[in-house]
Amino acid sequence: MKGLFVDTAGWLACADIADPAHVKAAAARDTWLQEGGLLVTTDYVADETLTLLRVRLGLATAEEWWQLVDSSPRLRWEYVSLARSDKARAFFFRYRDKEFSFTDCTSFVIMRELKLQEVLTTDHHFTQAGFLTLPK
């Protein structure tokens, strides 16, 4: 099954109807799922997403999002282990000319490990790291 990584910016764009990328992001996610694909995300991305949803859209929206993703059979959870964290830290400090967040670096490590090329996000850092972003 083909996997699409979902970054915090992708989750936010899908959840927030006021987000400029909402329509395209939700359509890209829905098309991916309709074509039999699997969504992939991490515990670090979920941490960021829950926090930002609560701040921007309220606790009820954050809770609704959590219930939706937590029960989804089409979502694969990946966790940032100590080994993955060590690799992410090395990546974080290697690219001094980029403003990658540490969470982004953990995502890059996991995406490379799982051989995922596509990511649902509006964050340009994924393009800088060599991944293909959706929506286009």
Regions found by a protein language model. Give the residues of each.
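Short, well-structured N-terminal submotif of metal-dependent ribonuclease cores
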Residues: M1-T41, R54-L68, P135-K136
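Alpha-helix boundary recognition
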Residues: L33-Q34, R54, Q67-S71, F93, ...
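Short secondary-structure boundary segments
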Residues: D43-Y44, D104, D123-H124
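Short acidic, glycine/proline-enriched helix-loop-strand junctions
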Residues: V69-S81, Y95-D97, F126-K136
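Active-site neighborhoods of divalent-metal-dependent phosphate/nucleic-acid chemistry enzymes
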Residues: L75-E118
